[in-house]
Amino acid sequence: MEDSEKRKQMLKAMRMEAAAQNDDDATTGTETSMSTGHLSNPLAETSNHQQDSFETQRFDYYTDPMAAYSSFKKNKTPKQQYISSPSHQGSSPVPPQFPPSVPPGSLCSEYQAQTNHGGFHAAHYEPRGMAHLSPSHRGPPAGWNNNFRPPPVNHSGPPQWVPRPFPFSQEMPNMGNNRFGGRGSYNNTPPQFSNYGRQNANWGGNTYPNSGRGRSRGRGMNTSFGRDGGRRPMEPGAERFYSNSMAEDPWKHLKPVLWKNCSDASSSSSTGQAWLPKSIAPKKSVTSEATHKTSSNQQSLAEYLAASLDGATCDESSN
């Protein structure tokens, strides 16, 4: 009896502990459900581990080649942002800045004279062979990158002069002459909107440096290259397709051959048969001649047997 009562008490105690544990689990579950109702934003809240991962990036050639060295990480400073938005550049145009070797007064006077005499068309000039390399795509040298900004071109208003960032002589020393010794083939006069281009650049009769280059450009412009490397104009019209050898007589140096008839050859021959070449002449039978020769030299089998019988009978009769 005592054992059963002890067992009942132990079961009650275990049930009470289980019930208390279930109540605790229910309260913790509600708290966690309430806390998960408002999720945190991982983008707004950055942890220290993420910051460390951003600071220590992996070595990459295109991102930061010096990130692999520890000394560079210690001395690393935040880079300055030099790039400005295009909206600010468009809203506040910067006045044109001229090269130091060119006085701005002469440029303005030359530009006004050009605009008064027929409009400004040289800024939009682009030769046919320069579709891939226009003046707007050329970048200034390293000394002018931070100082020169061309003003925005206003197509609806009055024409605005866009200055060149540097003289042509800095970009291409011998821009007038191509590598074959010839000159450009498009426009042989420099643009008339500025005066410093003639003074500081070696024009050499060519507006753009690449307008007269390459062998492929000379093929479609009726020009050809000689042995000396220069260009010479091709003959226009149908004369290009004419040669003196076309009018010469092709039968001039040929000698005639007399023709012989087959009947004449047959009459002159001793056999009286028609003459035929050896390739198609009838061949004599070789087997008949061979058999005839062998038969004339040797006896046949019947003759040999008859002769042998005669000889045997003669020997018997003599004995």
UniProtKB/Swiss-Prot annotation:
UniProt biased composition (Pro residues): 93-103
Comp. bias (Basic and acidic residues): 228-238
Gene disruption phenotype: Developmental defects due to abnormal miRNAs and siRNAs biogenesis including serrated, sickle-like leaf margin, reduced height, delayed flowering, and abnormal inflorescence phyllotaxy. Hypersensitivity to chilling and salt stresses. Several symptoms associated with alteration in auxin (IAA) signaling such as increased IAA levels in shoot apices and reduced IAA accumulation in root meristems, reduced apical dominance and abnormal root gravitropism, growth and emergence. Altered PIN polarity and endocytosis in specific cells.
Superkingdom as given in the UniProt entry: Eukaryota
Keywords assigned by UniProt, alphabetized: Auxin signaling pathway, Cytoplasm, Developmental protein, Nucleus, RNA-mediated gene silencing, Stress response
Composition-biased stretches (Polar residues): 27-56, 78-88, 185-210, 285-299
Tissue expression: Expressed in the shoot apical meristem (SAM), embryos, seedlings, root tips, and root and leaf primordia.
One BP annotation, GO: mRNA splicing, via spliceosome
Cellular compartment(s): Nucleus; Cytoplasm, Cytosol
Main location: nucleus
The keyword Acyltransferase belongs to this UniProt entry's keyword annotation: no
PANTHER family: PROTEIN SICKLE
Assembly and interaction partners: Interacts with ubiquitin thioesterases UBP12 and UBP13, and with protein phosphatase 2A subunits PP2AB1, PP2AB2, PP2A3, PP2A4, PP2AA1 and PP2AA2.
Task performed by this protein: Involved in miRNAs and siRNAs biogenesis and thus promotes gene silencing. Modulates auxin (IAA) transport-related developmental programs by regulating protein phosphatase 2A (PP2As)-driven auxin efflux carrier PIN proteins recycling and polarity. Required during development. Necessary for abiotic stress (e.g. chilling and salt) tolerance.
Protein name: Protein SICKLE
Organism, as annotated: Arabidopsis thaliana
Origin organism lineage: Eukaryota, Viridiplantae, Streptophyta, Embryophyta, Tracheophyta
